[in-house]
Every structure is written in structure tokens, then in C-alpha cells.
Amino acid sequence: MKELLSIHSAPAQHWVGDGFPVHSVFGYTGAEVAQRSPFLLLDYVAPCEFAVNLGQRRGVGAHPHRGFETVTIVFDGEVEHRDSTGAGGVIGPGDVQWMTAGGGIVHEEFHSTAYSRQGGLFEMVQLWVNLPAQAKMTPAGYQGIAAERIPNVRLTGGTGKVRLIAGEFAGFSGPARTHTPMNVWDVRVDSEQSVRLDQPAGWTTLIVVLSGTLTVNDSATLSAKEMATLSTRGAGVRIEASRASRWLLLAGEPIAEQIGRASCRERVYSGV
């Protein structure tokens, strides 16, 4: 079994722009950053309600990224994206956007026009994934992954399923193209049960709880907006859910390289 290394609880909510009240479950600073490689950051917008908005749409205006990828997973609501490559679109419930910043990209993210006009429930995750040195300057790109393209794989002997965004599970493959080997799974169970979700030895493994209560490898119990970091040693991952629960399983081959941060916006924009 993989050893439980740590449990982390997300700090208090803060706003990204005026459209995204996020809990930053983890980021790319601190002593444990190497234990989370290749994953850099995860922001979670827990279920919330937005009122009808007929004025300026809520969101985040144009801003640059470079050297990594952003993965936006929408559960409820809609996000509209545009970027400097000319790509864009609306990400609705169940959809995923996998954007490669690579050598540099400028993009903006707002509530869609349709969602703004009707308001309602909103929930999403944004995950940042590091790129290895040889891919840092790869051309910027955009993968728009509609919900119907994502396999929903039933868990053996249970009432849950794995939405396979990236990687492999039970003979199925996720649609996202990745630069390093990884699994990005959206897992949901409908009742109390125990499941095995083993990951390759040598891989980073993170369990991020979105709802419900989980016990990980008989070691610790987690609730919503908490994350377990497991060791790269071993392969076993056992999850016991005490009730209906949802979590993200993030696993991947670590990138054994130092993480650099741009010293100024001009340096980031220079790659665009």
C-alpha cells in the first residue's frame, strides 16, 4: 500500500476575479511541492449560487501563463474561454478544457452569457499541471473535451463510477492528451463502500475530496476540501466512503526538475 504522507485542508475561500470564489486546496509553493509533482495547483469552487446578471459578466480578464497546463473541470454552470491562439468556447456541466500554455498564452475566463442571464448553481475545479523542461516552450494549445467524450467506467462491485479524464482505468483510456504519464479521474460513489484504485509504483498520488467522507488506506479520514498525499513507494490505494462521496484522484510520474516562477509579467508575455 502507498503510505499516507500528509493531509491538507484548504484555507478560507478567496476570490479569483469576481466570478470564482475558490478554495486553494494546494499550490506550487511550500516544502511539500515535490511530493505533488507533476501537479502544481488546484482551486475548487465549491457549490454556490449566482444570481441573474444582465450587466458585465463575472470572471477574470486577460492574463498570461507560460510553461504549464491548466485543466478546467466544470460540474455546474458554464465558463466561456478565449485565448491568444484564437481558440475558445463554452465549458458546460461535465465538460473539461485542457489548455497548454507552453511557450506562452494570454487568456480570459468569464461566466458564459447564457449562464449569466439565468444564474443558478456553479461548481468547478481548475488544476495546473507542470510541463517537463523539454516541453516548456511547446506551442500553446487547447483541448476542448465535451462530457460525452469522457468514459464513465463502473466500479467493480459498487454503485460508483470513474469519469476518466486522462490516463487509463479498467481497459479504458481518457481523451486528454498529456505530456507526461498521469491519471486524472473524477470518482463518485452513491453509497457507503470500499474501492481499490491502485496506482503505479513511483507515481505521485493525490486524493482531493469534493464531497462526502473518505478513509484513505486505513490511515486517515478526510472530508470536503481536504487532500491526502500518498507516497510514490508502493501501489495500493484503498478508499472507504462512509456515504455518497465525490473525489478527484490525481496520479502521475513526477517531474524531477526545479519549478521556476517568472519574475515579472513582461517575461511571461514575451513568450506570447
Could you tell me what each predicted segment is?
Residues 1-265:
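Jelly-roll (double-stranded beta-helix
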Residues 266-272:
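Positively charged, low-complexity/disordered segments
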